[in-house]
Amino acid sequence: MTKKRYTLLKKDGKARRGEFVTPHGTIQTPIFMNVGTLAAIKGAVSSMDLKEIGCQVELSNTYHLHLRPGDKIVKQMGGLHNFMNWDRPILTDSGGFQVFSLAGMRKIKEEGVYFNSHIDGRKIFMGPEESMQIQSNLGSTIAMAFDECIPNPSTREYVEKSVARTTRWLERCKKEMDRLNSLDDTVNKEQMLFGINQGGVYEDIRIEHAKTIREMDLDGYAIGGLAVGETHEEMYRVIDAVVPHLPEDKPIYLMGVGLPSNILEAVERGVDFFDCVLPARNGRHGHVFTKEGKINLMNAKFELDARPIDEGCQCPACKNYTRAYIRHLFKAKEMLAMRLCVLHNLYFYNKLMEDIRDAIDGGYFAEFKAKKLEEWNGRA
């Protein structure tokens, strides 16, 4: 039996307010994880900044860190927490999504995936055991199982075959994680493993897979293979189908889905964990989130705008600078422009999750969601 780590504190409809205890601190859920692909948020945002803007969990990428600086180097430096000076939880993805996004550069076999590095073209092999070994070297708080992220659309026949293989890979991940956690030189002997539900947009395949993996007694469960081309309606349909078949005493993680409106819809359906590169990527291009939805600071109408990005926001950008100044920085190609907008967007997301938790605690989540969607009016 896995150690009990998740406590459901309150439900408001299907929306869940919980706590997830980890070796690196307790996570208050629902939670948005801030994505630092190479152990840093793109846009010159440091681990100290992340604490200032209310980040609970940082997410790093196994595939990219394996290529550079190399997971063995990170292990020699004491693991990711020590390497990037971050003492709160870290989740590492399995590398699966990146490997499968290489399309023409990879071959899938039962033992794993053969692919070419996107950096120098060298041949690399990654399977369940290799993914677990890399993540163990990184020493993250939560490791993700190695799975195939199925492209959309895919035939039913292919999806069934892929999901069966992903299940076999999950069994191998669990066995290897148990072995690694027992070794004397392991960075984090309490590293946790989340399994990933797959099945494309086929609800019956998704449900059967959820029923199968919930029996494996993992630390948490993710819904993967979404935000890859399906409509929002299809995505919500899959969440509605899967969530009732996952354990209520474990966190549920919707991978890679990150529009604020998507988050509200998924929380309403019982999801606890979220991540997405979207707020940082948008920020680097001057697209920032506000109470009224997303705006583009590059627009000429902000040239003389003396307001902060978002009135009342307590992020470092809004407390100190105007829209006009930040727009000027972008036009002048100053790096500070990206930094300020990334900080703002991540603060916006972290504050949104805090407000969501308060709404569930207070029993007014439905009203909160309706008000937010009305304010954003399709712009977030």
Swiss-Prot record:
Please give the pathway this protein is involved in. tRNA modification; tRNA-queuosine biosynthesis
Q: Does the keyword Transcription apply?
A: no
- Residues annotated to bind substrate: D93, S94, G95, G96, F97, D147, Q198, G225
Q: Which Pfam families does this chain map to? A: TGT
Superkingdom of this protein's organism? Bacteria
Q: Which GO terms describe its molecular function?
A: metal ion binding; tRNA-guanosine(34) queuine transglycosylase activity
How is this protein organized at the quaternary level? Answer: Homodimer. Within each dimer, one monomer is responsible for RNA recognition and catalysis, while the other monomer binds to the replacement base PreQ1.
InterPro entries named in the record = ArchSynthase1/Queuine_TRR, TGT, TGT-like_sf, tRNA_ribo_trans-like
Which species is this UniProt entry from?
A: Clostridium perfringens (strain 13 / Type A)
Q: Which family does it belong to?
A: Belongs to the queuine tRNA-ribosyltransferase family.
Role description: Catalyzes the base-exchange of a guanine (G) residue with the queuine precursor 7-aminomethyl-7-deazaguanine (PreQ1) at position 34 (anticodon wobble position) in tRNAs with GU(N) anticodons (tRNA-Asp, -Asn, -His and -Tyr). Catalysis occurs through a double-displacement mechanism. The nucleophile active site attacks the C1' of nucleotide 34 to detach the guanine base from the RNA, forming a covalent enzyme-RNA intermediate. The proton acceptor active site deprotonates the incoming PreQ1, allowing a nucleophilic attack on the C1' of the ribose to form the product.
Which PANTHER family does this UniProt record tie to the protein? QUEUINE TRNA-RIBOSYLTRANSFERASE
- Which amino acids does the record list as binding Zn(2+)? C313, C315, C318, H344
Q: What GO cellular component entries does it have? A: cytosol
- Cite the cofactor comment: Binds 1 zinc ion per subunit.
The coding gene here is tgt
- Needed cofactors: Zn(2+)
Q: What is this protein called?
A: Queuine tRNA-ribosyltransferase
The annotated active site, in chain numbering, is: D93 (proton acceptor), D275 (nucleophile)
Give the catalysed reaction(s), semicolon-separated. Answer: 7-aminomethyl-7-carbaguanine + guanosine(34) in tRNA = 7-aminomethyl-7-carbaguanosine(34) in tRNA + guanine
tRNA processing recorded as keyword: yes
Name the keywords, alphabetized.
Glycosyltransferase, Metal-binding, Queuosine biosynthesis, Transferase, tRNA processing, Zinc
